[in-house]
Swiss-Prot record:
Originating gene: Igsf11
Signal peptide stretch: 1-22
Matching Gene3D superfamilies: Immunoglobulins (2.60.40.10)
Disulfide bonds: 44-120, 165-215
UniProt name for this protein: Immunoglobulin superfamily member 11
Organism: Rattus norvegicus (Rat)
Compartment(s) of residence: Cell membrane
InterPro entries: Ig-like_dom, Ig-like_dom_sf, Ig-like_fold, Ig_sub, Ig_sub2, Ig_V-set, IGSF11
Domain Ig-like C2-type intervals: 144-234
Sugar attachment sites: 102
Length: 428
């Protein structure tokens, strides 16, 4: 810090003394450009009439990044050289042997931060007068870094897309040139290019817009490129595929629904058919009234019970169930059984009798009960032409029995009227 202050004091002193001396610093070329990493030479020379015994040279820099903070680069005073700012250590030196009237310096391995305005201040006592400051600009050039290529926007056919290209580094600022890598190396007719911003706008893209595009970033000392593949998407095939898939799915669903409906219908039909086949057609038949007994004959009361007699009305069949068949002849046989009791009741005694005529009870002059019983086999079942079942009557045997009142009273019988019944047991 003390050395820096002494250098600044010497620079001010030399400046004041230079007003009266004849020392003159020659004009510099104004600006020096160098690529990053290379060596830059900053020229500075002066003329004097005095010996170089008291020569003082100071190099200062005003950085481009921070103009308010000047920095010392190198100092020559009293026959010795002193380093300036830390970032210049080992990289800066005088091009010639000091002391000399050529006080140019070099900077090795230049960096981007080395860009700025350099000042050369020369004093050589006792010379006075002239201009003792030289100014030289240094620009460290940086080639463009590898640019980044992007696509902005939809790539569907008919859309607008923007091709972007930019480099992070590059001094001077690079320019960008887009081209399509085909036979013509030209952009589509609908493309608009901005070389400063590095953009290309392609409107209403089509299948012809597809291809490989190249962006070239360049400046004074170098170039760099990037590639971008633009593939325009045609929506028609995708829409056709979606429609085809939807139609196929709908068709499958319809087929499944039809199959389920048909299966349910056939199942219902077969089930209903089985139920119809299981049903036997029934016909309601009317029974005719049983025939009335024309005569009542007394029978012996002690009749064997093994005859299996039943109280029933005569079974008849309606003539409408017969197809032009004559009405069968009923063969009824009456058996008259007389017992000793019959003789005991004969004479003048009047015995009340009860007659069974099928519908009602009639009191007669003899007190005896006449029971009419039918015994016969069931009618034969015969099929008819219309699918119904008819029955063919068999011959029946009718037996009449007479029971005396005394016998009925002895067994505790009560007179009742039995209505006529059909073959099935229902009342007529």
């Amino acid at each position: 810090m003390t050395r820096r202050r002494s250098a600044l004091a010497s620079w001010l002193l030399l400046s004041l003394l230079g007003v009266a001396a004849s020392l003159e610093v020659s004009e510099s070329p104004g600006s020096v450009q160098v690529a990053r990493g290379q060596t830059a030479v900053l020229p500075c020379a002066f003329s004097t009439s005095a010996a170089l015994l008291n020569l003082n040279v100071i190099w200062m820099v005003i950085p481009l990044s921070n103009a308010n903070q000047p920095e010392q680069v190198i100092l020559y005073q009293g026959g010795q050289m002193f380093d300036g700012a830390l970032r210049f250590h080992g990289r800066v030196g005088f091009t010639g042997t000091m002391p000399a009237t050529n006080v140019s310096i070099f900077i090795n391995n230049t960096q981007l931060s080395d860009t700025g305005t350099y000042q050369c201040l020369v004093n050589n006592l006792p010379d006075r007068g002239g201009r003792n400051i030289g100014v030289t600009g240094l620009t460290v050039l940086v080639p463009p870094s590898a640019p980044n290529c992007q696509i902005q926007g939809s790539q569907d056919i008919g859309s607008d897309v923007i091709l972007l290209c930019s480099s992070e580094e590059g001094i001077p600022r690079p320019t960008y040139l887009w081209e399509k890598l085909d036979n013509t190396l030209k952009l589509p007719p609908t493309a608009t290019q901005d070389q400063v911003q590095g953009t290309v706008t392609i409107r209403n893209i089509s299948a012809l817009s597809s291809g490989l595009y190249q962006c070239v970033a360049s400046n004074a000392i170098g170039t760099s490129t990037c590639l971008l593949d633009l593939q325009v998407i045609s929506p028609q095939p995708r829409s056709v595929g979606v429609i085809a898939g939807a139609v196929g799915t709908g068709a499958v669903l319809i087929v499944i629904c039809l199959a389920l409906t048909s299966g349910a219908f056939f199942y219902w039909r077969s089930k209903n058919k089985e139920e119809e086949e299981e049903e036997i057609p029934n016909e309601i038949r009317e029974d005719d009234l049983p025939p009335k007994c024309s005569s009542a004959k007394a029978f012996h009361t002690e009749i064997s019970s093994s005859e299996n007699n039943t109280l029933t009305s005569s079974n008849t069949y309606n003539s409408r169930y017969w197809n032009n068949n004559p009405k069968p002849h009923k063969n009824t046989e009456s058996f008259n059984h007389f017992s000793d009791l019959r003789q005991s009741f004969s004479g003048n005694a009047v015995i009340p009798s009860i007659y069974a005529n099928g519908n009602h009870l009639v009191l007669g002059p003899h007190k005896t009960l006449v029971v009419t019983a039918n015994r016969g086999s069931s009618p034969q079942v015969m099929p008819r032409n219309n699918g119904s079942v008819s029955r063919k009557p068999w011959s029946q045997h009718t037996h009449s029995y007479t029971v005396s009142q005394m016998t009925l009273e002895r067994i505790g019988a009560v007179p009742v009227m039995v209505p006529a019944q059909s073959r099935a047991g229902s009342l007529v």
